[in-house]
């Protein structure tokens, strides 16, 4: 009898074909997010779960699913999943590194350009029927001759800097550990203090993971430092930013604009998270938002799902997964 795998969100048909010889599949091939109660009902006798960004696995969940052996996350950031609880229950927690790096960096730059050039308002103007031909309007901010500050210089921050070559911008960054001199010189990067980055950048791009140190790192105190009209772009994690502080900075005219692909309401592991995006923030004209599509490139999503599936297959075969967030004592290393 094949082990049971619960897949909580829609995946490509190719992934179902890959998994079918190894598992009894219980899928969700709709565009609806299953409730926690429904996922629990499906997982009570399951040996494996393929999880996605809206899902949350904690000690209570694992206790209700005693046969679970692996939670294979089709994502990179696993802050909604309790690593210690999985380890204590002997459940592998796996993730997919690296594949989200390039599309997230691309989207960040796209959001920066769109925000600076007022693409949201310009698009609405054309669609309204009011456009009758060229007029001197929608003057914005370009990347050429601008100072771009990147907060965080992990894989995504590096990918942002790499893709900003040739845009004519001056690049600076803040990271607890400085890059090596060769990398700084190759990318034209200058390390500055976090406060200086906020005070001297025309564009501020966030490239941080979410953890106890970074939650609400971008707060009222930091936003009070920005030069008037500066633009803030968040493609990383919603709760890195205090959205209430962002709204206040927008309303007083200090922050020139805010673009985001991620929102505080998505960070399920936070008991105090907002349950929705503030309507006043959504309505503010100097904002540009996308619905967490940083990895929404078909080829990328397919490969993310394939890697998540392969991690699950490895565990169900008695081997170590290729990319694990935790360490368990048993099982042989996987053959990559």
UniProtKB/Swiss-Prot annotation:
One of its GO terms (molecular function) is hydroxypyruvate reductase (NADH) activity. The active site is at 237, 266, 292 (proton donor). The keyword Disulfide bond does not apply. InterPro entries: D-isomer_2-hydroxyacid_DH, D-isomer_2_OHA_DH_cat_dom, D-isomer_DH_CS, D-isomer_DH_NAD-bd, NAD(P)-bd_dom_sf. Optimum temperature is 35 degrees Celsius. One of its GO terms (cellular component) is cytosol. CDD domains: PTDH (cd12157). SUPFAM superfamilies: Formate/glycerate dehydrogenase catalytic domain-like, NAD(P)-binding Rossmann-fold domains. It catalyses: phosphonate + NAD(+) + H2O = phosphate + NADH + H(+). Its EC number is 1.20.1.1. Coiled coil: none annotated. It comes from the Bacteria. Keywords: NAD, Oxidoreductase, Stress response. The keyword NAD applies. Inhibited by NaCl, NADH and sulfite. Homodimer. Catalyzes phosphite (phosphonate) oxidation. Belongs to the D-isomer specific 2-hydroxyacid dehydrogenase family. This is Phosphonate dehydrogenase. It comes from Stutzerimonas stutzeri.
């Amino acid at each position: 009898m094949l082990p049971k795998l619960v897949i909580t969100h829609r995946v490509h048909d190719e992934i179902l074909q890959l998994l079918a010889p190894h598992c009894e599949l219980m899928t969700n091939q709709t565009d609806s997010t299953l409730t926690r109660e429904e996922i629990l009902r499906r997982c009570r006798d399951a040996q494996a779960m393929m999880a996605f960004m809206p899902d949350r696995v904690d000690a209570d969940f694992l206790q209700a699913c005693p046969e679970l052996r692996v939670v294979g996350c089709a994502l990179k950031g696993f802050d909604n999943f309790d690593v210690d609880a999985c380890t204590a229950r002997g459940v592998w927690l796996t993730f997919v590194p690296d594949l989200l790096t390039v599309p997230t960096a691309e989207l960040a730059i796209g959001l920066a350009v769109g925000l600076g050039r007022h693409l949201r308002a310009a698009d609405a103007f054309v669609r309204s029927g009011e456009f009758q031909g060229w007029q001197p309007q929608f003057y914005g901010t370009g990347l050429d001759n601008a100072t771009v500050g990147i907060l965080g210089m992990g894989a995504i921050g590096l990918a942002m800097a790499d893709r900003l070559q040739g845009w004519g911008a001056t690049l600076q960054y803040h990271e607890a550990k400085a890059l090596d001199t060769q990398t700084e010189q190759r990318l034209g990067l200058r390390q500055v203090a976090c406060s200086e980055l906020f005070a001297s950048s025309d564009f501020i791009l966030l490239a941080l993971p979410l953890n106890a140190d970074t939650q609400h790192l971008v707060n009222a105190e930091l936003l009070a430092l920005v030069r008037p009209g500066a633009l803030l772009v968040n493609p990383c994690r919603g709760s890195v930013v205090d959205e209430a502080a962002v709204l206040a900075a927008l309303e007083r005219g200090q922050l020139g604009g805010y673009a985001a692909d991620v929102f505080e309401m998505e960070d399920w592991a936070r008991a105090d998270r907002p349950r929705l995006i503030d309507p006043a923030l959504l309505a503010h004209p100097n904002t540009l938002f996308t619905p967490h599509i940083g990895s929404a490139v078909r080829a990328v999503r397919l490969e993310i799902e394939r890697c998540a599936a392969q991690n699950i297959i490895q565990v169900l075969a008695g081997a170590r997964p290729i990319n694990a967030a935790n360490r368990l004592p048993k099982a042989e290393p996987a053959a990559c």
